Amino acid sequence: MKPTQFGGSSSKMTEPIEYVTLISDDSDGEPTPKRNVNHPPSALSAPNPGQKQKHPDEDSNDAPATSDERRTSRRNRPKVDYSNRPSGSGDTASNDKSGSASMGPNNQQAERRSQSQTRKSEANATSSSVSGPSAGNSRPSQNGDSKDRDAGTPTVLSGQEGAVFQSRLPFNKMTPNEEACFPDISRSGILGHRVFLNIRNSLLHMWVDNPKIQLSFEIALKNLPPPFDSEPSLVRRVHSFLERHGFINFGIFKRLKPIPAKKLGKVIVIGAGISGLAVAHQLQQFGMDVIVLEARDRVGGRISTFRKNSYIADVGAMVVTGVYGNPMTILSKQIGMDLVPIQQTCPLYGPDGKPVPKEKDDVIEREFNRLLESASYLSHRLDFNYAGDCPVSLGDALEWIISMQEMQVMHKRGQHMQEIIATQTKIIEQRRRLKTLRDTIGKLKNEHLAMINQRKPKGTDGDLKYCYQEFNIRNTQIKMEETISTFHDLHAEEKQMLAKLHELEQNRPSDVYLSSRDRLILDWHFANLEFANATRLNNLSLKHWDQDDDFEFIGHHTTVRNGYSCVPVALTENLDIRVNSAVKEIKYGTKGVEVVAENLKTSNSQMTYKADLVVCTLTLGVLKVAVAHKESQQSNTVKFDPPLPDWKQQAIKRLGFGNLNKVVLCFDRIFWDPNANLFGHVGSTTASRGEMFLFWSISSSPVLLALVAGMAANLVESVTDDIIIGRCMSVLKNIFGNTSVPQPKETVVTRWRSDPWARGSYSYVSVGSSGSDYDLLAAPVIPPSSKDAEGLPRLFFAGEHTIRNYPATVHGAYLSGLREAGRIADYYLGYPEGTPPDIGYSVAEAANLVSVGNVVKLRDLSPNLSDSSPSSKKSEENSNSNTADSTELQ
């Protein structure tokens, strides 16, 4: 999650990188959106189909290897409007309030490498939107404004198409999960598909248009246009399917039908973070008895908001990373989240506190993106992912590329010096020849003059001697003239050589690839990328670190003015949540589960809870402690009985869990530019590059939030608050002056790694891991005592570390909760309402295909975003029988 990706520099490098010649410089440019005349006016503009694609890896979601969003291929993405607005109303939509369904478009550029990105900013403890990919990727432009950002953005989607896009589903074809749950429709041919898709898309449109009120079957049937309302049984099935899997009727809304009084099963949810609250809320709506156990004295987990007097600051998750397709957009309409788009200007200040010149910043940012492109090229094109038997990290690859560039610069310097020496040698030799010719000319001139002076008149010594005398005079004159001509030619050549030597001396190559100052600015971008991934670059998998980039949401990245904690607080409505209850042991078997929890307010007071199943939303950091096989008295050590299967434990160990910390500074007045949400500070050393490298100002109140990433994020956990605050103040005074910066009134320093209930910030794909580990972490566990290998799972998992396509984000954690609620309902409640008994599909098989939020890549969400690469065309041909023409679905 990756950071937000912003526009890259358009500056030209004075000298291209030799080994990157296969990567076009055009990767920094935006492709011009193209209209598809075969589709209705509301259709999306498609990205340039000529962009290169990287071949997908068999066990990963590797995105196309364009130059990369973080990675730096920038892709135009569509804007979405969910109202029945004419396609020409894009300008109006862009002026809507950020909290509405049709938020202003942002020309987000998902860079596959810059990670920066973009990127994982959120599910966890601290994230934001700079870098990046990603996305990764690059930092906000210093001179960007909203008009420039929106220029050239694709057309807004409206109506059904916009609602389906918001639901992360393809508009004109069934998903694998839908085909599994509707096998009769899947086999019925194109007409049956059209009927299904029209019903499904209409229901999604009804829900997205008004998510504050329950969309009941009766209302849905009443509002369906004919002839689709003529099959109430199919409408009921589609409605039940969408409701079960979290596409409609999720979040906080007014129920028109009461929750079933008879409870259909008992569930224990461990953790009241966003994923735990999502699954608990859904299962309660489904009629199950749910208890939530939370070790903290509050809900929200890594969503935590500091509130004191008029000061508000999110010390955990902070940014809504893209509004189109994001379930947080629906929640914002339900609970009054005050979403504020992030301004993209981000001035950068050097170690001396002086602004970094824009030209220099542009050049270094461009080089940063090219380095990421080169790393992607090494991994995905050259398959250079191992050094011997050891997997290569992104950090290693980047440093190797920099070293190769340094060697290339040294080689060029050597070549240049050799050329100078060769030219100087030629000039010396030329001057020797000129001196010889000059002497020869003088000698011939003297001989010629002597002959003239000694010349005898004709007839004095006879005709023969006279002729001989004249011959010698003329011959000497000819030799002298020829020698003078040769001298002039050589002198002209000497002038050319001198001009060439002067040019060589005036155009000496750089002494180094990066000067010490340039390297520090590059390190700022690396720190930004480390912030996006919550870890040092040396810990990231070279091949898979950005495996989720193709699924990033588009649109503005926003902050929540009234604090992100308003979301988990709202989701606690009518839930039975036991705070201060630290789970110590989870026992699961074929007959049910038992969870032993300790009440932290009354020491040594333990309670045992029994249920049919348990949903574990413990963070990956806490799970790592649980499977470490070390006896520990830590308060957050959880024991699984029986132990988790080896495949689950190995995935927990392989996947990385990073750290990112924040420093909140509350002042009595604003002394920085109130129009800028961000400003960066370049560290004085590579080792300290992540130390207070970025400052956020996300509200109208005088509050600054400093980010501490990479190596520095772990170091600050062992340092006192006074030292950290002092360092922050030193940086600010260096930038704004001693007299301009007052002492803070309130301060907060986070230490997420030391937090016993978090053990870090959010997940990342570490060296030796891949996207498939997210799938393994998401898989439910069947008790080993079960005689049936396909027995009933009793242990389920949710959280940002369990969702492959949206890891390290709040929306990913929330979607994982919806996913598990649907999976549990399939296993324990049976077929959705209205499903015929002879439908011919296994409910367990359907449960295994549950994929809320894991449906398709962004480019597959609309017929106008289809990929024209050969591989995608082949895939399209193979699925033709399951695809309905979008023009016929209107």
From Swiss-Prot:
EC number(s) reported in the record: 1.-.-.-
- Indicate whether Repressor appears among the record's keywords: yes
Gene3D superfamilies the record matches: 3.90.660.10, ATP synthase, gamma subunit, helix hairpin domain, FAD/NAD(P)-binding domain, Winged helix-like DNA-binding domain superfamily/Winged helix DNA-binding domain
Question: Which InterPro entries does its entry note?
Answer: Amino_oxidase, FAD/NAD-bd_sf, Flavin_monoamine_oxidase, Hist_Lys-spec_deMease, Homeodomain-like_sf, SWIRM, WH-like_DNA-bd_sf
* PROSITE patterns assigned to the protein according to its UniProt record, in alphabetical order: SWIRM
Biased region (Basic and acidic residues) positions are 110-122
Q: Which residues form the SWIRM domain?
A: 160-259
A molecular function annotated in GO for this UniProt entry is: flavin adenine dinucleotide binding
Instruction: Give the cofactors, semicolon-separated.
Output: FAD
> Which stretches are tagged as biased composition: Polar residues?
1-13, 84-109
Functional summary from the UniProt entry: Probable histone demethylase that specifically demethylates 'Lys-4' of histone H3, a specific tag for epigenetic transcriptional activation, thereby acting as a corepressor. Required for heterochromatic gene silencing. Acts by oxidizing the substrate by FAD to generate the corresponding imine that is subsequently hydrolyzed. Demethylates both mono- and tri-methylated 'Lys-4' of histone H3. May also demethylate 'Lys-9' of histone H3, Plays a role in the repression of neuronal genes.
Q: What is this protein called?
A: Possible lysine-specific histone demethylase 1
What is the organism of origin for this protein? Drosophila melanogaster (Fruit fly)
User: Taxonomic lineage of this organism?
Assistant: Eukaryota, Metazoa, Ecdysozoa, Arthropoda, Hexapoda
By which gene is this protein encoded? Su(var)3-3
